[in-house]
Amino acid sequence: MDHSIVLKSYGKINLGLDVLRRREDGYHEVRMIMQTVGLYDVLTMKKRKDDKIEMTCNLSFLPTDERNLVYKAVKLIKDKYHIKDGVEINLSKRIPVAAGMAGGSSNCAAALKGMNQLFDLGLSIDELCEIGVTLGADVPYCIWGGTALSEGIGEKLSRVDAMPDCYILIAKPGISVSTAFVYKNLDLPALSKHPDIDGMLECLKEKDLTGICNRLENVLETVTIKEYPIIEKVKKHLCLLYTSPSP
């Protein structure tokens, strides 16, 4: 019972994110290219002698009960496969919260993989993804990792050419943005320009890092920048740093 497993839960960025339409069920149909980055949380899991799920986290403001996707994932697997043992979980967060980096979905994906490993369930990646999509649209991608084209509500995944190795600077202002708020306030008919997803795919194929950088675009910024002008300020500052001559 003392055996524990340690899993890295990687964050992601969107190289390009387009929203095509709002579906009748309230979800939005998207077309986006996602990329795993080197920043990760750490999930430690081990069996308990009782049947309880106990979760701890280094961030006191995050819930550690049924409201947390990790807890939900563990409970779902326990119930689905009639697992009697309990599970002890520790989550050490490094990925910024509410930053659009799929931290929660990545943690959920790691928990599903952890349960598969901890209890020798023998589930395939496809089977884990089928379970994961019931917990969140980004979870299947986080199970995959790497570079992928995501379509539908995020559950239709296609492996695409990997992004060239490079350093990525991630800036997170002191704000938290609700994904639900952003999608609710997205005015699709008013969008005059959409990200060049096909062009991005071609640049990935050609390993054209400059072309990739020139096509970085996210339609959700039409909402977030209006609501949080600091985002535009940070972007402009980073551009000035990039174009400033060396001393």
Language model features: what each stretch is:
Residues 242-247:
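Conserved small/polar residues in nucleotide/adenosyl-binding loops
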Residues 51-57, 111, 208-216:
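Short, basic/glycine-rich phosphate-binding loops at helix/coil junctions
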Residues 2-8, 12, 16-18, 22-32, ...:
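ATP-dependent small-molecule kinase catalytic core of the GHMP/sugar-kinase superfamily
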Residues 107:
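Conserved cofactor-binding/catalytic machinery of classical short-chain dehydrogenase/reductase
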Residues 70-73, 111, 234:
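Generic structural signal for hydrophobic residues
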Residues 1-99, 117, 121-126, 163, ...:
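ATP-binding N-lobe of GHMP and related small-molecule kinases
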